[in-house]
From Swiss-Prot:
This is Type III pantothenate kinase. The keyword Iron does not apply. It comes from Burkholderia ambifaria (strain ATCC BAA-244 / DSM 16087 / CCUG 44356 / LMG 19182 / AMMD) (Burkholderia cepacia (strain AMMD)). One of its GO terms (biological process) is coenzyme A biosynthetic process. PANTHER family: TYPE III PANTOTHENATE KINASE (PTHR34265:SF1). Homodimer. Its EC number is 2.7.1.33. GO terms for cellular component: cytoplasm. Its cofactor is NH4(+); K(+). The gene is coaX. Substrate binds at residues 96, 103-106, 189. One of its GO terms (molecular function) is pantothenate kinase activity.
Amino acid sequence: MNDPHLLIDAGNSRIKWALADARRTLVDTGAFGHTRDGGADPDWSALPRPHGAWISNVAGADVAARLDALLDACWPGLPRTTIRSQPAQCGVTNGYTTPDQLGSDRWAGLIGARAAFPGEHLLIATFGTATTLEALRADGRFTGGLIAPGWALMMRALGTHTAQLPTLTTDIASGLLAGAQAEPFQVDTPRSLSAGCLYAQAGLIERAWRDLADAWQAPVRLVLAGGAADDVARALTLPHTRHDALILSGLALIAAEGAAQD
């Protein structure tokens, strides 16, 4: 089967897509908002008709309906598969006690990470609306994870639920901290809030990495992904690897496995 696969990652903040060729290479990519207010619709008119669409959607029913409408407008009747976490798939074994409770984005990311770093123990940190951590052993066993508020959500919660603290976006906070992160403590409220929430992210990652390395008594590669990864990386004292296509790469593997079974 040489037809490309359309891959869609509908996250809590935006929707990313890619077209994967027969070698699972992402040959076209893009992103758009949950609604038209979040930006223009994707222009898929120049793309070849794909074999089908494989979708990870953690954004809910309204986004699912929007995706269906976009796909039907471009390719009426295109087969589509909305993935769910499985007990085992593409070389990864799901360690959740109830496997289908694991978010489909995290599942696809685990599959993508195992393919990107075969034979390595991994801690995968993804920075979105939530910050998620996944522990993946070299043999493909996902042993569990952690979920915390993301950097933006932490700052928004403080601004919303206090009388005197500002509500800061990550763009504002990143600008405030440019050149200021070398100082361990900040000297005004906006920078103190920005740095405190950022260091909370970094501290979580470093504690989890050390606990994992101690528990496994082996080297663990730290892999960072997601929108706030650059900012969090500057606050880390650990070596790390950046990879921003784990979910789409995992979807490409799931799509290839599914197409081979057709």
